[in-house]
From Swiss-Prot:
The modification N6-acetyllysine is found at K9, K22. InterPro entries: Znf_LIM. It comes from Rattus norvegicus. The keyword Metal-binding applies. Keywords: Acetylation, LIM domain, Metal-binding, Methylation, Zinc. This is Cysteine-rich protein 1. SMART domains: LIM. PROSITE patterns: LIM_DOMAIN_1, LIM_DOMAIN_2. GO terms for molecular function: peptide binding; zinc ion binding.
Length: 77
């Protein structure tokens, strides 16, 4: 029986969500920063931990500076 990477308890088939190559309990698959409940495949990963794509992952690990990587973040010289 697989164990949830968050709570380390057994994950039964009826409550299983597979993401990041592991089986999670649905309530355990949350963003590490804001705590938002995530869906399988609807999030980003950093060092094996799930993060919501926006704003948490992009703010923490995306390009830094004004606009965080959007069209307005390029500086012309």
């Amino acid at each position: 029986m697989p164990k949830c990477p968050k709570c380390d308890k057994e994950v039964y088939f009826a409550e299983r969500v597979t993401s990041l190559g592991k089986d999670w309990h649905r309530p355990c698959l949350k963003c590490e920063k804001c705590g938002k409940t995530l869906t399988s495949g609807g999030h980003a990963e950093h060092e094996g931990k799930p993060y919501c794509n926006h704003p948490c992952y992009s703010a923490m690990f995306g390009p830094k500076g004004f606009g965080r990587g959007g069209a307005e973040s390029h500086t012309f010289k």
